[in-house]
From Swiss-Prot:
Its main location: membrane. Pfam families: Complex1_49kDa. It comes from the Bacteria. It comes from Orientia tsutsugamushi (strain Ikeda) (Rickettsia tsutsugamushi). This is NADH-quinone oxidoreductase subunit D. It is found in: Cell inner membrane. Its EC number is 7.1.1.-. Transmembrane segments: none annotated. It catalyses: a quinone + NADH + 5 H(+)(in) = a quinol + NAD(+) + 4 H(+)(out).
Amino acid sequence: MALKKRSKHSKKFKLNLGPQHPATHGVLRLILEMDGEIVERADPHIGLLHRGTEKLIEYKTYLQAIPYFDRLDYVSPMCQEHAFALAIEHLLKCEVPLRAQYIRVMFSELTRILNHTLNIATQALDVGATTPLLWMFEEREKIMEFYERVSGSRLHANYFRPGGVSQDLPEGLIENIADFCEQFPCKIADLETLLTDNRIWKQRTVDIGIVSKQQAMDWGFSGVMLRGSGIAWDLRKSQPYDQYANLDFDVAIGKNGDCYDRYLIRIEEMYQSIKIIKQCIQKMPAGEIRTQDPSISPPKRSEIKKSMEALINHFKLYSEGYNVPAGEVYAAVEAPKGEFGVYLYSDGTNRPYRCRIKAPGFAHLQGLDFMARGHSLSDIITIIATLDIVFGEIDR
């Protein structure tokens, strides 16, 4: 078969994008095969942030393993703690108090806002708009303050626990979160004023990185990447956990499967998160914030000061941990980036025999090649941003 005759003016070459590049959203190395300005192939090279998290977890007790999950997707840490806590609770068959469930849902939705504000702000920055970044970081600061007040940390919260949460909400926090819910929709509206009908923004996002329904399912996409293609799949609705089944909210889906649709879905999800948080505040009862089973939950400080048995129990839980019944379970949550899952295999000891982590960004990055083909180099930056990738969870 005769080879296709190439024009003497055409020039094909390979371009290395990253890993030290701000628009790759982490340590992504992309080898792009270019025909002039057009991308013919995109080959992602990952593993530069690999820390062996899954293996490290095997050497820790179930309680000691929780902080590792904050360091996976470090933009939305509490949602990953949530998945690990649910997996352990399934094996332990322990009941989570109602107040703790509402607290976990509320902070999961605050985490969703934390994630989406950063994604939209950095995506706008990548295409040349700087104002959204400044506006959204101001809002993120407020949520990080809520994190700090409830857990002592702005980022790596280590707040969720098997059976509940580590401590109750401090005085005045619930009122401050309610105030935030009243003013934040106006900030989203301001952001939409800047971007949604902006013709430059639409030129950079409409019909860029199109993913069909079939492609989204074939590549194992989830979250916004799946709903952007018109598939209404959200684990909070389809496989509800904690109190999501008792909360009223809508699932936003797109029509065209392009970067613009995915941006609109993230905007709508922030509105829905505010709606969920308001319901959590209204419905949250008084009561315990973690299970009262002494074999799982450490005693209160007031008890430790009065009872030697409580002190011994506290010491044993934090040093030796507790044994989890033998078995295996897969627990997944609707994290901001998609379905974050934890497969946990217990051999009946105080440490996981195996912990397999399913990160949504890993599947999404695999689809970069087919999404990028035929687009210009500048469009690749937009596609990387719309994938919403963080290499803590991809490389693990």
